[in-house]
Amino acid sequence: MVLKTELCRFSGAKIYPGRGIRFIRGDSQVFLFVNSKCKRYFHNRLKPSKLTWTAMFRKQHKKDAAQEAVKKRRRATKKPYSRSIVGATLEVIQKKRTEKPEVRDAAREAALREIKERIKKTKDEKKAKKAEVASKAQKSQGKGNVQKGALPKGPKMGGGGGKA
């Protein structure tokens, strides 16, 4: 069975069920005190940090060193581990790492040039197709091509098509 304990708003002591004094301020803020001494000091506006027996004072003056001695866990530092990436072996990565910047720049420029040429080629092909389509459309318009069976647009006639 687990008991739901509360903390005294003045002294910081544990308050077990059925114990304590509950004070509800005008702004609906709830204060729970362990005994009338804490309640009295709170209403007299005494500072719990100045009273030696409160949890706040003990914490400020490092009195509960035995209680606070919780081990700080150090994170294990991860050792660098070299492994290959999908699509590239360790040898390829090492070779790229050791090659000179000039060689790397030259390879990058060559790749960019190749990409630009490919883009230009596709653009030229699209332009040629557009021109071809436009010339075909002009030839077909020149002949006076009229669709067969097309009715002239005009006002619609009819009564709405409802039940009679």
From Swiss-Prot:
Chain positions covered by the region annotation Disordered? 63-82, 117-164
**SUPFAM superfamilies reported in the protein's UniProt record:** Glucocorticoid receptor-like (DNA-binding domain)
Compositionally biased, Basic residues: which spans?
A: 71-81
Write out the GO biological process terms: cytoplasmic translation
Name any one Pfam family assigned in the record.
Ribosomal_L24e
GO cellular component terms, alphabetically, are: cytosolic large ribosomal subunit
Would the keyword Zinc-finger be found if you checked this record's keyword annotation? no
The superkingdom of the source organism is Eukaryota
What are the UniProt keywords, alphabetically? Answer: Cytoplasm, Ribonucleoprotein, Ribosomal protein
GO molecular function annotation: mRNA binding; structural constituent of ribosome
Compositionally biased intervals (Basic and acidic residues): 117-133
Localization in the cell: Cytoplasm
- InterPro entries of this UniProt entry? L24e/L24_sf, Ribosomal_eL24, Ribosomal_eL24-rel_N, Ribosomal_eL24_CS, TRASH_dom
Member of which family? Belongs to the eukaryotic ribosomal protein eL24 family.
Question: What protein am I looking at?
Answer: Large ribosomal subunit protein eL24
Tell me what gene encodes this.
RPL24
